[in-house]
Amino acid sequence: MTEATFSPDRRAMMGLAALGLAAAALPIGANAALANEPAGGAPPKTGLTPDQALARLQAGNSKFLGNNRPLADLSNARRLALAKGQAPYAALVGCADSRVSPEHLFGEGLGELFVVRTAGNYVDDAGLGSLAYSVAALGVPLIVVVGHERCGAVDAATKLVTGNKQLPPVLTRMVEPILPAVVDAQAHHASQGGDLLDHAIHYNVSHVVKQLRESRDPLFSEPLSEGKLKIVGAYYDLDTGKVEFFDRG
């Protein structure tokens, strides 16, 4: 969403919903306070490095592709353990599309992935705060922005830019954050050819990756500079089921 569509009151309400009342009440940049929040019997934070977390996602997608899909642990014991707290090893920004369920694509169950989903996999204030919480409070070492083949939101943004479609006001506002990626994709398409929509989907992912990497909030900038956090892009092929990672920095 653009700044104009987010009033301070609405931004605050969405931030509280995303982070929880206790976390949202902390001052911005309170890394230590978030990181040292009492666990209350919660599982320990992941010990994976960013590269190890990425390798686990890749391995999970390989199993998904090979029909060797491990059964997720949905037992009562697992549920009760997670009731005490969460310790995901990766955060994902994904599209709201019903065909793109991150847990299935990467063969994971409850409590393994911290997922933020919006149509078009962009990040607004609530999403940004949610991701910051996953890094600072939960110790996530990896954020992956996942776009996907034939994304309806990016397609709508592309048609809006090319003048081939008009959208209702609420949908126009929804795709506004995607429009700069479409403009960049148009320039690439003019010189390189190929499918404009596919280019726009990739550029949209790269724009969000850049947005997160260049955030001035210390909850992102500090772990990035220390090598404790990595932010990468990915593209999910609906036809093959394969997730291609790119823009790894």
What are these regions (language model features)?
Residues 2-21:
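N-terminal secretory signal peptides and thylakoid transit peptides that target proteins
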Residues 28-66, 70-74:
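C-terminal segment of N-terminal export signals and the immediately downstream linker at the start
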Residues 188-230:
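Charged, glycine-interspersed solvent-exposed loop segments at helix/strand-loop junctions
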